[in-house]
């Protein structure tokens, strides 16, 4: 059974709701990375600026530890009660926690309680983000035409980047309009306060949604699981052990602390790189629809391993044009990998446990690889004294992920999102006609 064709009006509503909510979610989550240097000074004071920065980036990574738990709780909610309630809750949690970060007193005011409260709120952000990616991707793709799922999947990757991009624009505005002293004293709080009205908008948009045709079909068949997590052992979760994480929020820190650019110039270049990434995402999605998910994600992973070191060499040159070339090369292959990753997470799991399984699989990889990314990158750059050092981590992750995917990943193009079977007519040129259900 194919996903029912939606009307043009409903398609616009579905895409708009998923995109808007995802932008708001990642805007809130990314602000921390853009203000990591300032937050490090205020909440982790030290005689060494590097030590303060590393402490702030460590807290950035702490949020990723909570993402698997958020995936479990919000994924279970989405599989039991519907995709919409979980998506609405994720926006609420992110908005409240981000707003509260804006209100936190610094270490100079309340001492050690300040970093402890910051860690707690970052954990809530991580919990929320743990359910957002898989939930939004599932909601979008369960509404998408089967032959356009790759293109629709690119909306999630692109809007994630747009959310980060908008956070960068706001950070740029604060840098341009305020002095460094004003940013440190109170200006950094203003972007975080934007989370409150944005959360209200996100809640309104998502509350008005209907649930997906796939979940409605499960309800009609009385196949909605009461305990979806119990069946995950058969769902193929172990086949997604590693993922890719775009170090967008680290780039601006790298450009200012390692390369030596001014903050305004670093933010402009980072914003440009994110814009390029978001523009490439639809092309990556169409590639997956045309040639298959497996070859596209393998090309992305292998490409990242190849271009990471040259890209960081260009980034480390300090020349804006060369930096932009390096970011563009990195963004192109990152888009191929990330767009297909979201699509595969939906198509690999059965409808009854789709959000739980994909959220846990994705977030375990993020907690192990993505969360420590900025901290590892900054530590390598500081320890080795090389601007190219963060690329070593990217190469290692990309190679390991590509090898694992090449070994275990089936082709999923043409998968029916209810039955889990794949039409032989949709098979790619490899001739692999294995159904997804058989690979579980």
Language model: regions and residue ranges:
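Extracytoplasmic gate region of multi-pass secondary transporters
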Residues: 33, 234-277, 370-374
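A late C-terminal transmembrane helix in Major Facilitator Superfamily
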Residues: 352-384
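Hydrophobic core of transmembrane alpha-helices in multi-pass small-molecule transporters
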Residues: 110-130, 321-336
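C-terminal ends and interior cores of transmembrane alpha-helices
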Residues: 45, 92-111, 302-317
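Cytoplasmic membrane-interface "Motif A"-like loop-to-helix N-cap segments
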Residues: 80-92, 290-301
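Glycine-rich segments within core transmembrane alpha-helices of 12-TM secondary carriers
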Residues: 151-175, 198, 362-373
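Helix-to-loop junctions at the C-terminal end of transmembrane segments
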Residues: 69-83, 281-293
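C-terminal transmembrane helical hairpin of 12-TM major facilitator-type secondary transporters
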Residues: 294-341
């Amino acid at each position: 059974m194919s996903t029912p064709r939606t009307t043009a009006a409903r398609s616009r509503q579905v895409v708009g709701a998923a995109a808007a909510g995802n932008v708001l979610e990642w805007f809130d989550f990314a602000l921390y990375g853009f203000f990591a240097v300032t937050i490090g000074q205020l909440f982790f004071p030290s005689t060494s600026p590097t030590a303060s920065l590393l402490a702030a980036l460590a807290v950035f990574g702490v949020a990723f530890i909570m993402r698997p738990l958020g995936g479990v709780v919000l994924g279970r909610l989405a599989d039991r009660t519907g995709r919409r309630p979980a998506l609405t809750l994720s926006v609420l949690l992110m908005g409240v926690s981000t707003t509260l970060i804006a209100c936190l007193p610094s270490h100079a005011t309340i001492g050690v309680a300040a970093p402890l409260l910051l860690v707690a709120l970052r954990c809530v952000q991580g919990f929320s983000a743990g359910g957002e990616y898989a939930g939004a991707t599932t909601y979008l793709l369960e509404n998408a035409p089967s032959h356009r799922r790759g293109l629709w999947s690119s909306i999630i990757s692109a809007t994630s980047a747009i959310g980060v991009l908008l956070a960068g624009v706001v950070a740029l505005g604060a840098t341009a309009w305020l002095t460094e002293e004003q940013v440190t004293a109170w200006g950094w709080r203003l972007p975080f306060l934007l989370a409150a009205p944005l959360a209200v908008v996100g809640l309104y948009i998502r509350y008005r949604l209907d649930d997906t045709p796939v979940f409605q079909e499960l309800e009609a068949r009385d196949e909605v699981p009461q305990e979806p997590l119990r069946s995950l052992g058969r769902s193929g979760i172990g086949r997604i052990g590693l993922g890719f994480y775009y170090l967008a929020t680290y780039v601006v820190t790298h450009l200012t602390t390692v390369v030596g650019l001014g903050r305004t110039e670093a933010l402009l270049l980072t914003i440009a790189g994110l814009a390029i990434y978001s523009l490439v995402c639809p092309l990556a999605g169409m590639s997956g629809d045309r040639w298959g998910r497996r070859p596209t994600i393998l090309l992305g992973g292998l490409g990242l391993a190849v271009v990471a070191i040259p890209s960081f060499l260009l980034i480390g040159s300090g020349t804006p044009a060369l930096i932009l070339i390096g970011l563009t090369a990195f963004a192109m292959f990152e888009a191929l990998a990330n767009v297909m990753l979201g699509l595969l997470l939906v198509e690999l799991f059965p409808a009854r446990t789709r959000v739980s399984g994909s959220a846990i699989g994705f977030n375990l990889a993020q907690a192990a690889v993505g969360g420590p990314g900025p901290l590892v990158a900054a530590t390598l750059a500081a320890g080795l004294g090389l601007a190219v050092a963060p690329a070593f981590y990217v190469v290692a992750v990309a190679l390991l992920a590509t090898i694992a995917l090449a070994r275990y990943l089936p082709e999923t193009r043409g998968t029916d999102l209810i039955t889990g079977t794949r039409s032989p007519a949709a098979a790619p040129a490899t001739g692999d006609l294995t159904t997804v259900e058989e690979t579980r």
